[in-house]
Amino acid sequence: MYFMNLLTTIIPILLAVAFLTLLERKVLGYMQLRKGPNIVGPYGLLQPIADAIKLFTKEPLQPLTSSHVLFIIAPTLALTLALMMWIPLPMPHPLTNMNLSILFMLALSSLAVYGIMWSGWASNSKYALIGALRAVAQTISYEVTLAIIILSILLMNGSFALSTLITTQEHIWLILPSWPLAMMWFISTLAETNRAPFDLTEGESELVSGFNVEYAGGPSALFFLAEYANIIMMNALTIILFLGAHNNPMFPELYTTNFMIKALVLTTLFLWVRASYPRFRYDQLMHLLWKNFLPLTLVMCMWHVTLPIILAGIPPQT
């Protein structure tokens, strides 16, 4: 029974990832005044399936000088962690209802760094290693602000469980009282998932493809799946934290519909940002975080701590 629950979570995620790649290619195509994929199937709808067959039937080449065990473990770990992060997400019912679900997600997102680091190191290629070092520095840096923003939101929520955020946002979305946090959160999620304009790790112009440059076929596809699963997961988390959909216990499917429409809008926003902005320079990327976002998030966190204490003595207004 538990195995079925797991499958009914994993298979839709992988399908969503497959069609997100098609959506991205279509959206970017139309933004660049071309059609995008339109050969395989009607309107190119079977393109993701063709891509999957092509990638997983190719020979998974390995450099002779690479560390063979780590070389295979790294992409597997990346995808496993990306899928595990979906476990505590309430949509409206999580796969496992944890008391400390947000801490579980933060711990897993920190572990995901190891997959990237191992892939760069195990490839035994200078380009892959430079890409991996950039990715690790970027991911670890932006996790700091993500954690502080989450802490500020949880101070308003009063619990570490994500499911209570649905109740918290019954009357007002948290994006309205905490819009500066929401703006910094969105930009940090772009950086955390290595998306343009923060795709320093891929840096086609200087690093060929970044940490996965030596990967071909199946293992390369696993990294690809992990990246896109993380994008959808981050958007889902954004909705739970800031744009909570009202959950009517009589019609739980309405919650899921509402949730997925918002997720689609946010994902399209990710693609729009990719089509519109050039890549940041590495020092600009770090300055944005350490000089701008970190002080601002710390101030906002202190504000959320002190505000309830300041207002505690005021009698309720009628």
UniProtKB/Swiss-Prot annotation:
Cellular location(s): Mitochondrion inner membrane
An annotated Gene Ontology molecular function: NADH dehydrogenase (ubiquinone) activity
Membrane topology field: Multi-pass membrane protein
Keyword NAD: yes
Gene Ontology cellular component list: mitochondrial inner membrane
EC number: 7.1.1.2
InterPro entries membership: NADH_UbQ_OxRdtase_su1/FPO, NADH_UbQ_OxRdtase_su1_CS
Reaction(s) the record says it catalyses: a ubiquinone + NADH + 5 H(+)(in) = a ubiquinol + NAD(+) + 4 H(+)(out)
Segments traversing the membrane: 3-23, 69-89, 102-122, 146-166, 171-191, 222-242, 253-273, 294-314
One Pfam family in the UniProt entry: NADHdh
Class of enzymatic activity (EC top level): translocase
GO annotation (BP), single: mitochondrial electron transport, NADH to ubiquinone
Keyword vocabulary terms for this entry: Electron transport, Membrane, Mitochondrion, Mitochondrion inner membrane, NAD, Respiratory chain, Translocase, Transmembrane, Transmembrane helix, Transport, Ubiquinone
Subunit: Core subunit of respiratory chain NADH dehydrogenase (Complex I) which is composed of 45 different subunits.
PANTHER family named among the record's database cross-references: NADH DEHYDROGENASE SUBUNIT 1, NADH-UBIQUINONE OXIDOREDUCTASE CHAIN 1
Main function: Core subunit of the mitochondrial membrane respiratory chain NADH dehydrogenase (Complex I) which catalyzes electron transfer from NADH through the respiratory chain, using ubiquinone as an electron acceptor. Essential for the catalytic activity and assembly of complex I.
Family: Belongs to the complex I subunit 1 family.
Classification via HAMAP family: NDH1_NuoH (MF_01350)
Record protein name field: NADH-ubiquinone oxidoreductase chain 1
Provenance organism: Cnephaeus nilssonii (Northern bat)
